[in-house]
Structure formats: structure tokens, C-alpha cells
A protein has these predicted regions:
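Extended active-site neighborhood of metal-dependent phosphoesterases/phosphodiesterases
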Residues: 80, 162-250, 271-284, 292-327
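Beta-strand-rich domain onsets/edges
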Residues: 12-22
């Protein structure tokens, strides 16, 4: 991994798809109309998940998933070199077929998968009013510097922020893929803490690829309201997700917070349910939450925290977004 630049202002079903409850295909949405049309290309080897099981699409681009009792979404691991305006589908009663369209785009990849992305966190807005300047700066920088994607690691903030943030910063208007994590202040009143987040941003854990790296989005464990998901939910999905990743491929984990103060990165759900992320070639853990500008090495991986974009950090760091570069080794 290259030095980062601060700019101011992981059991069950880990094989090829087999017969199951949910089916569909992953295709290249050439005309961008959001539906599969005759003649459009399907894609082999794309990961699709029901939030527990993870399978790869077949040679014909098709998948089949069994579903599970805690299912809410079907979602894909968006492949490198493609973007999608929706990487997930909320599961509807009586509907069993779900297709996923992806669109090619220029991720500015190097010959060995090198690329860069932009990290923001803790924007904590209540309205889109007054946010125009930093959103514009971020968009322009992403374009000028050839960012592969933008990641927001949570604390979009309460009902107002959750409802207003995505319309002002999304894959369409930023012209690069935009991904979101859930933070503690994004767990709000509802049937369960992430209900509103899910209705706007989709699943709270998922993955995507860019260049030579596999990126994993994970949720905050707690917050202002109790979440419906558990560590066990994330553990089982993550284990199945990582089982599909080629050995040695670099991984980066995104979360709102940082989970260790030691030199090992172990995802633990208790009762022996542990995943050694370092054994999966973890390169970095990228987070926010504490509102500081901080980079340190824990073992073989970097811990990278970026201060808030609109207000700066509690450590007196300037308001910032961060450019992170991945070299040929991740």
C-alpha cells in the first residue's frame, strides 16, 4: 500500500451456484435501463449473496441461492471495472428471481490493478443545505485524480442525514461508485436500528472489488438504537465471502470504528467463531468515528482514520477527505 494523502477542506455454501430458492443473473446493462435485455452480456464468476450464503455465477451468468431465515437482501460483490446504481435487492414476498445489472466504467486501474480511492467519514449532516462546497470539491477531486470509488465510513447522522445524504452524494452525481457504511448515529428509531438505513442504502454488510483488492464493508456493533443484525450474522457471511477470494488477494476492511489495539486483526463473534483477517492478507482497516486524522501500523496492516470532512477533527486536524493508493501488492 502506498502512503496515504490527506486532502483538506469473511462454511455454508461457498461453491459455484446450485439449485435453491432464489435465482437470477448478473449482466452488463449496456443501455442502462435497469433490466436485462436480449443480447446483453452475462458475467461469469460474480459473487452473489443472500446475506449468509455466497455463490458464484455460472458460465451463463446465472446464480441460485437457498436463502435463510434471517434474509433481507440479495446482493452482489460488484466486480472490478464495473459500477452499479444498486448492488442489492430487498427480498419481496413471493418474488424469487432477481437480476443484477452492472455498467463498465473507467476505474483508472494500473497494469497490475493499482488504483486509488477516496475516504470520508462522519459528515453528520441534517440537511443538504450548506454542504454544496465540500461535495463539489470531492467530486472534482475524484474526477481529476482518477479515483476508483468513494467510501463513507458512517455517521451520516440521524434521520435527517440518512434521508438527505444519498441524494447529494451517490454513484450518479459523483460519477464514480459511492459506498456507505453504517455508524452508531445511523442506528435510529424503528423496528430495529438499521431499518431506515436499509431502506435507503441497502445491506449493512457487503463487499466489492476494485483492481487487485477485495473490499469488505462491515457494520458498527451498536449505537443509538439496538441493531437487528448480530456478530454471528456478519461472521457467517464474512467466512463465506472470504472462502471465495483467491488466496493472497489483498483485502481492506471498512467499518465505522476500529476493533483492536493490538497487532492482530481477528473478527470474533464469540464461541470460537473467529476469523484471522491477517491470514487473508489484510492490508488496511479504514474507519472514522473518533474524528481524528490518524494512521498507524498494527502488525502487517494499517489502521487509517480520517477526520471529518465538514468540521475537522477533535485533534485539531483540518477538515479533510483522504486519498488512499493501492499499489501492485495492494
Amino acid at each position: 500500500m502506498k502512503a496515504t494523502t490527506v486532502i483538506s477542506c469473511l462454511l455454508l455454501a461457498s461453491a459455484t451456484a446450485t439449485a435453491g430458492e432464489y435465482t437470477g443473473k448478473v449482466y452488463v446493462d449496456a443501455n442502462r435501463n435497469g433490466q436485462f435485455d436480449k443480447g446483453e452480456k452475462t458475467l461469469k464468476g460474480i459473487l452473489v449473496s443472500d446475506g449468509l450464503n455466497v455463490v458464484k455465477t455460472s458460465a451463463s451468468g446465472e446464480y441460485s441461492l437457498p436463502g435463510h431465515k434471517r434474509e433481507r437482501f440479495l446482493f452482489i460483490t460488484t466486480p472490478s471495472g464495473y459500477k452499479t446504481f444498486r448492488h442489492y435487492h430487498a427480498i419481496e414476498n413471493g418474488k424469487t428471481e432477481y437480476d443484477f445489472g452492472v455498467i463498465p466504467y473507467n476505474a483508472h486501474l494500473g497494469g497490475k490493478g493499482e488504483h486509488a480511492f477516496l475516504h470520508i467519514s462522519d459528515t453528520e449532516i441534517s440537511t443538504a443545505t450548506g454542504q454544496e462546497e465540500w461535495v463539489s470539491d470531492l467530486r472534482k477531486y475524484a474526477h481529476n485524480e482518477g479515483a476508483a470509488f468513494i467510501i463513507h465510513t458512517g455517521d451520516i447522522c440521524y434521520e435527517g442525514g440518512l434521508k438527505n445524504h444519498k441524494p447529494m452524494m451517490n454513484t450518479v452525481n459523483m460519477e464514480v461508485p459511492v459506498y456507505y457504511c453504517i455508524g452508531n448515529h445511523d442506528l435510529v428509531k424503528g423496528k430495529y436500528g438499521e431499518e431506515l438505513f436499509e431502506s435507503i442504502y441497502g445491506p449493512v454488510y457487503y463487499s466489492f472489488d476494485a483492481g487487485n483488492t477485495h473490499y469488505i464493508v462491515t457494520p458498527m456493533w451498536g449505537g443509538d438504537y439496538r441493531p437487528g443484525y448480530t456478530k454471528e450474522d456478519v461472521y457467517h457471511w464474512l467466512k463465506n465471502d472470504l472462502a471465495q477470494i483467491p488466496e493472497g488477494k489483498p483485502i481492506v476492511v471498512f467499518n465505522h470504528d476500529y476493533w483492536t489495539s493490538g497487532d492482530r486483526h481477528v473478527f470474533s463473534a464469540g464461541k470460537g467463531m473467529d476469523i484471522d483477517l491477517d491470514a487473508h492478507n489484510l492490508k488496511a482497516w479504514v474507519y472514522g468515528h473518533v474524528h481524528i486524522n490518524h494512521i498507524t501500523r498494527h502488525g502487517n496492516a494499517l489502521a487509517i482514520c480520517t477526520s471529518t470532512l465538514a468540521r475537522g477533527g477533535i485533534d485539531h486536524a483540518t477538515s479533510a477527505f483522504r486519498k488512499i493508493g493501492m499499489d501492485s501488492k495492494g
